[in-house]
């Protein structure tokens, strides 16, 4: 801002010159005092001027008694989980009142490194949504000896992203054992961020006591992995903010709300983390989180604070989060606070969404990034690579325990004379494998999975958090091979197979993570794919097949996971033998 612009802003705020826009007959949400102010709100040059009945302007908006709410801010979300580009993502969330997100692109960066980040930054320029990226801190998610990622990010790349203005802070530090143990490479990443005065996001499921003290002392600022109230309170008492997650699958917020009090609410923020397109289109984003918070007994103004001013203060976005003179004019209009149905969304004082629709053109181009359309690299795949060597009558089996965590089950399993697994429909145990797809290593980790419900067929996906190797589950090796081959042919996404035939395909050609389909077509195809998996392959009804399979390699969330290197005991961060 230059001197003349500042003078103009001051003159307009003082009423010496007319505003650009006024909103009259408005009920303005004052998030600072948790109250409602009835009056006229003035805006000029993308900034709020103030609230005063004497303001005038050529452009007058009559709110007709609607509430004016600050724009909603999501402090932690993965755009790739919606399987769309950043540009399309903006068109999905802005009609729900979201005006700013802090996005962690660690899915595409795990696949394509800095090239993936550059694509995300380029696509973000094609939406009105303000997207600020945090630099993925753990690529791969944990120790490289546990899995093979498409790229490796070190302190050098993190510094490069800061120096080039590509990122706003350091994304969730999933390698929390590395922080607690003061690993050398981890210290380098932390220091380059601390010295640059960048925010460091957390990820520390079940961490407590002195380990949590060490994590917070290292400069980690927040955590979104709390599942119980005691975890939340532990973090708040250490000066950390807690992000209450309400995603498509992981919905920890209702449980955590039981621990929110007038005394600690200012340290609580709402976040989505992982949200599918169909959820965003049909249910909502932070607007839905606010509704659910209110339904769970949170005062509407407190719920709004948790999606606006709390988040702005937590993330250092001092130019937004409230309706006050000089702040960025991001706001929305709603009829009433309890139901919180967003009628219109404004960013920088301009209306960009109304009545559930995005009002601007959506440019979903991948021009200049054609290399990201071919990221599934795989030699000829055969059933021999899926063989197990079971030497015991009992095996370590991944048990689908909760929304995000798994069990390390020790179960009796049948096997043939050569030691390979023998599937029995009555036992709901199937084979699961992770196939390396980045560097032609030939790595295949094979294990067993319980609770998925699959019968007579196979499902494969290129979404395998966080290194995004291929994940395949099946009742027989032949269908699993067909699924892997089909996934290679479409360059990623999801594939369902039965009796040797592909019965459903869902292509995600951008990095094997995001679709280039029009959004309505994509959502229809996702619904159809899920229906086939549930009705023809008998996948457990409450599971989204791809999201559930995609979490199986996530070797930073307890307890038992599988990667291209084998079974990972997350409590020990080591590869274990399948035989028990």
Curated annotation (Swiss-Prot):
Keyword Hydrolase: yes
Cofactor: Mn(2+)
Catalytic activity: adenine + H2O + H(+) = hypoxanthine + NH4(+)
Stored CDD domains: AdeC (cd01295)
The protein's Enzyme Commission number: 3.5.4.2
Gene Ontology biological process terms from the UniProt entry: adenine catabolic process
Keywords: Hydrolase, Manganese
Protein name: Adenine deaminase 2
Pfam families documented for this protein: Adenine_deam_C, Amidohydro_1
Gene Ontology molecular functions: adenine deaminase activity
Enzyme class, broadest EC rank: hydrolase
Keyword Cytoplasm applies: no
Cross-referenced InterPro entries: Adenine_deam, Adenine_deam_C, Amidohydro-rel, Metal-dep_hydrolase_composite, Metal_Hydrolase
Family: Belongs to the metallo-dependent hydrolases superfamily. Adenine deaminase family.
């Amino acid at each position: 801002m230059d001197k003349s612009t500042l003078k103009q802003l001051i003159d307009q705020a003082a009423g010496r010159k007319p505003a650009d826009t006024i909103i009259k007959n408005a009920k303005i949400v004052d998030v600072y005092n948790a109250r409602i102010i009835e009056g006229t709100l003035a805006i000029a040059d993308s900034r709020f001027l103030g609230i005063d009945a004497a303001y005038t302007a050529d452009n007058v908006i009559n709110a007709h008694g609607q509430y004016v709410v600050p724009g909603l801010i999501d402090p932690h979300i993965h755009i790739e989980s919606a399987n769309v580009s950043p540009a399309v993502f903006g068109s999905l969330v802005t009609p729900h009142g979201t005006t700013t997100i802090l996005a962690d692109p660690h899915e595409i960066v795990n696949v394509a490194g800095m090239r993936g980040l550059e694509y995300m930054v380029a696509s973000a320029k094609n939406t009105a949504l303000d997207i600020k990226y945090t630099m993925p801190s753990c690529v791969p998610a944990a120790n490289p000896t546990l899995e093979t990622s498409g790229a490796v990010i070190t302190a050098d790349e993190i510094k490069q992203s800061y120096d080039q203005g590509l990122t706003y802070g350091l994304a969730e530090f999933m390698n929390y054992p590395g922080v607690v143990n003061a690993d050398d490479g981890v210290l380098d990443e932390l220091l380059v961020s601390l010295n640059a005065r960048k925010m460091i996001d957390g990820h520390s499921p079940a961490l407590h006591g002195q380990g949590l003290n060490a994590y917070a002392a290292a400069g980690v600022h927040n955590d979104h992995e709390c599942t119980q109230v005691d975890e939340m309170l532990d973090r708040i008492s250490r000066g950390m903010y807690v992000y209450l997650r309400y995603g498509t699958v992981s919905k920890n917020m209702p449980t955590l709300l039981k621990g929110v009090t007038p005394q600690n609410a200012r340290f609580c923020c709402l976040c989505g983390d992982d949200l599918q397109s169909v959820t965003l289109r049909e249910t909502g984003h932070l607007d839905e989180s606010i509704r659910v918070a209110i339904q769970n007994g949170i005062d509407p103004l407190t719920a709004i604070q948790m999606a606006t001013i709390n988040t702005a203060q937590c993330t250092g976005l001092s130019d937004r989060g409230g309706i006050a003179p000089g702040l960025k004019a991001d706001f929305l209009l709603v009829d009433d606070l309890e139901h919180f149905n967003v009628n219109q969304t404004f960013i920088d004082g301009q209306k960009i969404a109304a009545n559930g629709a995005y009002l601007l053109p959506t440019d979903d181009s991948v021009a200049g990034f054609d290399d990201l359309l071919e990221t599934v690299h795989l030699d000829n795949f055969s059933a021999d690579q899926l063989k197990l060597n079971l030497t015991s009558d009992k095996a370590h089996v991944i048990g689908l325990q909760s929304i995000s965590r798994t069990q390390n089950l020790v179960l009796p399993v049948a096997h043939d004379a050569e030691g390979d697994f023998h599937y029995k429909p009555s036992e709901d145990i199937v084979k699961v494998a992770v196939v390396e797809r980045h560097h032609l290593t030939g790595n295949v980790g094979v294990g067993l999975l319980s609770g998925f419900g699959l019968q007579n067929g196979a499902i494969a996906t290129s979404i395998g958090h966080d290194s995004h190797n291929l994940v395949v589950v099946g009742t027989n090796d032949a269908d699993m091979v067909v699924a892997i081959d089909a996934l290679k042919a479409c360059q990623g996404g999801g594939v369902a197979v039965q009796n040797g035939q592909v019965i459903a395909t869902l292509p995600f050609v951008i990095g094997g993570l995001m679709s280039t389909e029009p959004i309505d077509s994509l959502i229809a195809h996702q619904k159809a794919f899920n229906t086939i998996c549930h009705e023809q392959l008998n996948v457990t009804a409450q599971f989204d097949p791809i999201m559930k399979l995609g979490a199986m390699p996530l070797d930073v969330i307890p307890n038992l996971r599988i990667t291209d290197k084998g079974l990972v005991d997350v409590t020990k961060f080591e590869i274990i033998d399948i035989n028990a």
